[in-house]
Amino acid sequence: MENFFIVKKLASATYGKALNVDLNKLLQALNHHSLQGLISYCSALTILHYDYSTLAARLSVYLLHQSTASSFSKAVSLQAAQSCSRLSSHFVDVVYKYKAIFDSYIDYSRDYKLSLLGIETMKNSYLLKNKDGVIMERPQDAYMRVAIMIHGMGRVVNMKMILLTYDLLSRHVITHASPTMFNAGTKKPQLSSCFLLNVNDNLENLYDMVKTAGIISGGGGGIGLCLSGIRAKNSFISGSGLRSNGIQNYIVLQNASQCYANQGGLRPGAYAVYLELWHQDIFTFLQMPRLKGQMAEQRLNAPNLKYGLWVPDLFMEILEDQIHNRGDGTWYLFSPDQAPNLHKVFDLERSQHENAHREFKKLYYQYVAEKRYTGVTTAKEIIKEWFKTVVQVGNPYIGFKDAINRKSNLSHVGTITNSNLCIEITIPCWEGNEAEQGVCNLAAVNLAAFIRESSYDYRGLIEAAGNVTENLDNIIDNGYYPTEATRRSNMRHRPIGIGVFGLADVFASLKMKFGSPEAIAIDEAIHAALYYGAMRRSIELAKEKGSHPSFPGSAASKGLLQPDLWVRCGDLIPSWENRVAQTTQGVLTPKKWWQLRLAAIQGVRNGYLTALMPTATSSNSTGKNECFEPFTSNLYTRRTLSGEFIILNKYLMDDLEEINLWSEDIQQQLLNAGGSIQHILDIPAEIRERYKTSREMNQKILTKHAAARNPFVSQSMSLNYYFYEPELSQVLTVLVLGWKKGLTTGSYYCHFSPGAGTQKKIIRNSEKACNADCEACLL
């Protein structure tokens, strides 16, 4: 009861409803323990009004401010004086030299804009601590630290860009990736998020990749490994006269490495392993995530890894024919030592014409004719085995190998054999002479920051995309590389990955529903603007600093933009420019796209520009919904490394308050329904339709939205699906639809659970299965 009266006073003072309350005096009368209790108490009241969560966040910020330095330079000075300081001397020197500018520009009041989940995430993961675990900086200090790392650590201190980047970060217009946030300004600034490794079939390289992955993970990077080149189990090893163990024991070894090499001590290590479907060990691979009992006791499972399938068009064609009884689904299995290079070729075209450029199909059937196969199965049997596992653990992911390669600006560099931890990064990588290990630096733009009453500010989005492009390009030069092969790859291709978050917030603010023609058009236009802004700035940077070394021969060097590759493949109609011009109200016209093509021929700074990653941490910090996803629920608890937090859909609450419907009765019905409003008939049908959760909407809607935005994505996207029941037919429907529409990602996670209306839990847990595992490429 005491908490209730204190909270009532605090709420009145905070929101200006009781001017006779001295907020500072009231807070100073409370000790640390009492304030922590109030934070928990306020958080529990979120179901009544999201302002309680806001109040809890402000109390948490107040508590942090009481124990940290009151100026940026002082915070840096205190950290530098620590015996085990992580800060680099160069960074400290820059801060001391320009401390008057930094101290006067930083705005600590912006810390109070963070959500409760945001401030707790910052405290747990991003803010620098001393050796005893005591937090030494505030969120604004972290934003300034990142800005200085990006624009102040080179030969020239670009003060204008430092302050602009700080401003964009602190106002939550943009966010940078987790490794950038917690490693910026330190002695070993590994700022990159995603790493791609290709494992060769020799003992030395097999163990080298264990070491490399562990080193990368220790610096905060997430890892994707291609295993398609490893010979199958029982294959003969001529050098020793023995038989191969295949991929299973190696996967177990990488699983152990991941568990040991956590990400900078801040969160668990995170690896994903990829395999092509023709590999003899494919069934073993598909079973490993779910092995239990005796197999688990013998340590033949690897439950901590993520798994991904690299799926060629040929398999999808055979699968579709088998589904529709047009063929028997025969699928041949090979060991790469007997049938080499299948993972190194792809089909440039999807045409069935005999003269079509289909190198994978040609080589596959050549090996069949030569009887090099070691097993025979059917496409259905493989997909059924995949489904058994995906129902239990949500993955293996599905990446469409040929679509990824034929739509890559870097297809001339080499075949893309795998993706990263969250299947949105697609960089060629290989071992051997002049080895390259793929690297990508990530950031994301807050789409909700550009809502202007009932319209959208595409010009602002274009400008922000340009600023992020320059930031990420600098990170390539200023970051630490764990291996020479990672440095070589990043310097040669200079790939960046700009993502988004808050798309659902945009639709809610504009009172649109997912799947409507208007929403799909805006989705397309937003990602067109994002790509345009990034490409425009990359071209400008090329004029200033030079193109990336692998630019000659790239699609851009021939005047082909990312959507042009989709048009060439027949997956996008040529009139897309007119459609985007109409949606953006003339901001992006066909003429501007042609000017961009002509300029690109002269040079582009970055081989890749956009990639749509999960953004749980950014969403947590800013109170916006994750990446391009619909709302998972209108009320749920979010479990993170920072604890559990109640999340209430503020847009729904505002809409219901607007029509005087937000009441205790509605709150209770929302609780009873597990966050769904579909059966609360007092709520108008139009609002119920707009606030369908990700599971309640037809999953084809998610595929159609993905198809609208994918042509403007340089790499790929972390595309989730949500189903009530584990029915293979439903999953196949969206996978085949996505493949036919030319998507690069078939699926990231597939979530299955009973519908909200059938659950009687008070609050349903958020289904972010990847949250604790995949945060390396989360923002």
Swiss-Prot record:
Disulfide-linked positions: 194-440
Alphabetic keyword roster: Allosteric enzyme, ATP-binding, Deoxyribonucleotide synthesis, Disulfide bond, Early protein, Nucleotide-binding, Oxidoreductase
Annotated source species: African swine fever virus (isolate Tick/Malawi/Lil 20-1/1983) (ASFV)
GO molecular function, one term: ATP binding
Regulation: induction: Expressed in the early phase of the viral replicative cycle.
Name of the molecule in the record: Ribonucleoside-diphosphate reductase large subunit
Gene3D superfamilies: 3.20.70.20
Pfam families attached to this UniProt entry: Ribonuc_red_lgC, Ribonuc_red_lgN
Family of this protein: Belongs to the ribonucleoside diphosphate reductase large chain family.
Subunit (UniProt): Heterotetramer composed of a homodimer of the large subunit (R1) and a homodimer of the small subunit (R2). Larger multisubunit protein complex are also active, composed of (R1)n(R2)n.
Gene Ontology process terms (BP): deoxyribonucleotide biosynthetic process
Marked site: Interacts with thioredoxin/glutaredoxin: 774, 777
Site-annotated residues for Important for electron transfer: 748-749
Known function: Ribonucleoside-diphosphate reductase holoenzyme provides the precursors necessary for viral DNA synthesis. Allows virus growth in non-dividing cells. Catalyzes the biosynthesis of deoxyribonucleotides from the corresponding ribonucleotides.
Database matches in InterPro entries: NrdE_NrdA_C, RNR_lg_C, RNR_lsu_N, RNR_R1-su_N, Rrm1
Organism classification: Viruses, Varidnaviria, Bamfordvirae, Nucleocytoviricota, Pokkesviricetes
Site, as annotated: Important for hydrogen atom transfer: 194, 440
Catalytic activity: a 2'-deoxyribonucleoside 5'-diphosphate + [thioredoxin]-disulfide + H2O = a ribonucleoside 5'-diphosphate + [thioredoxin]-dithiol
EC number: 1.17.4.1
Residues the record lists as binding substrate: 178, 193-194, 222, 420-424, 614-618
Cross-referenced SUPFAM superfamilies: PFL-like glycyl radical enzymes, R1 subunit of ribonucleotide reductase, N-terminal domain
Activity regulation remarks: Under complex allosteric control mediated by deoxynucleoside triphosphates and ATP binding. The type of nucleotide bound at the specificity site determines substrate preference. It seems probable that ATP makes the enzyme reduce CDP and UDP, dGTP favors ADP reduction and dTTP favors GDP reduction.
Location of the active site: 420, 422, 424
Annotated site, Allosteric effector binding, chain positions: 201, 231
